[in-house]
């Protein structure tokens, strides 16, 4: 008797629970007629969330089909999940390059290294050259020359500001010959007295006015200087007489400190 009564109680309890869940899945409309709920998945997910068992965790919102208005970071904190989601966009592997293009790649890399090395070399040279004297300092440099050892009719060459300077001790015949030249026949007309401070001494820069070559002293058709590069002839006063040079030899700034002391610059 007791066993039969227990079976009847268990069957009635099961029917009551099934009736409860079946009724909860229906909604009553305005016409008082039962209607099927339009979202059975929402009801099942809601039933899963109200369970109190510790073994069942709440599923993330994106698995339940729910759209959350919370930011992704906040949603991840409120709904933690042990499922690891990899961001494939940050782990994308590029396809291997074409082997036929390796030569070009090596050429580009080698050229870049060469340009880099050249730039470093230029920077080092610029730094080293900046430690030398500037052009302003070199422009103020002067040179003192002793004239006592120069024989009449001879020419000596000294270096001043990186350029050769010709110093010629002229004889009386040289002075007469320089003053007897007709200025009308000169390409760059200039009297001998305008080019010297002492008629005995002629001081000129030893650079041809054509293309910058160094003329040879005591040579040429006029007894002065001859440029072997293109055949320019200068007379005993350093004036151009023949050849492609357009101007006379330059006269630098100089002065006599003593009778036999010359200061150039």
Swiss-Prot record:
NCBIfam families in UniProt: Rieske_proteo
TM ranges: 103-125
PANTHER family per the UniProt record, alphabetical: CYTOCHROME B-C1 COMPLEX SUBUNIT RIESKE, MITOCHONDRIAL (PTHR10134)
GO molecular function, one term: 2 iron, 2 sulfur cluster binding
SUPFAM superfamilies, per database record: ISP domain, ISP transmembrane anchor
Cofactor descriptive note: Binds 1 [2Fe-2S] cluster per subunit.
Catalytic reaction list: a quinol + 2 Fe(III)-[cytochrome c](out) = a quinone + 2 Fe(II)-[cytochrome c](out) + 2 H(+)(out)
Residue ranges occupied by any Rieske domain in the UniProt entry: 175-263
Cofactor requirement: [2Fe-2S] cluster
Note: The Rieske protein is a high potential 2Fe-2S protein.
Transit peptide: 1-53
Keywords: 2Fe-2S, Disulfide bond, Electron transport, Iron, Iron-sulfur, Membrane, Metal-binding, Mitochondrion, Mitochondrion inner membrane, Respiratory chain, Transit peptide, Translocase, Transmembrane, Transmembrane helix, Transport
GO cellular component, one term: respiratory chain complex III
PROSITE patterns: RIESKE
InterPro entries: Rieske_2Fe-2S, Rieske_2Fe-2S_sf, Rieske_Fe-S_prot, Rieske_Fe-S_prot_C, Rieske_TM, Ubiquinol_cyt_c_Rdtase_Fe-S-su
Location(s) in or outside the cell: Mitochondrion inner membrane
Highest taxon above the source species: Eukaryota
Sequence ranges on the Mitochondrial intermembrane membrane side: 126-265
Disulfide bonds: 213-229
EC number(s) reported in the record: 7.1.1.8
Binding residue positions for [2Fe-2S] cluster: 208, 210, 227, 230
CDD domains: Rieske_cytochrome_bc1 (cd03470)
Name of protein: Cytochrome b-c1 complex subunit Rieske, mitochondrial
Similarity comment text for this entry: Belongs to the Rieske iron-sulfur protein family.
């Amino acid at each position: 008797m007791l066993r039969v009564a227990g079976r009847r109680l268990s069957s009635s309890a099961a029917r009551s629970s099934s009736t409860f869940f079946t009724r909860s899945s229906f909604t009553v409309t305005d016409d008082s007629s039962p209607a099927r709920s339009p979202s059975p998945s929402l009801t099942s997910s809601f039933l899963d969330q109200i369970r109190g068992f510790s073994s069942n965790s709440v599923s993330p919102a994106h698995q339940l089909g729910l759209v959350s208005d919370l930011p992704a970071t906040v949603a991840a904190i409120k709904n933690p999940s042990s499922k690891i989601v990899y961001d494939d966009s940050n782990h994308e592997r590029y396809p291997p390059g074409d082997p036929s293009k390796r030569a070009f790649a090596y050429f580009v890399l080698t050229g870049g290294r060469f340009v880099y090395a050249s730039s470093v070399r230029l920077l080092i040279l610029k730094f080293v050259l900046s430690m030398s004297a500037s052009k302003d300092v070199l422009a103020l440099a002067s040179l003192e020359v002793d004239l006592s050892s120069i024989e009449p009719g001879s020419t000596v060459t000294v270096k001043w500001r990186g350029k050769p300077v010709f110093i010629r001790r002229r004889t009386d015949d040289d002075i007469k010959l320089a003053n007897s030249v007709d200025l009308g026949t000169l390409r760059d007309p200039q009297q001998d007295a305008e080019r010297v401070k002492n008629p005995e001494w002629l001081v000129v820069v030893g650079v041809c006015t054509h293309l910058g070559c160094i003329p040879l002293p005591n040579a040429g058709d006029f007894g002065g200087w001859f440029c072997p590069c293109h055949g320019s002839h200068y007379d005993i006063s350093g004036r151009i007489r023949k050849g492609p040079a357009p101007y006379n030899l330059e006269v630098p700034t100089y002065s006599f400190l003593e009778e036999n002391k010359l200061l150039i610059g």
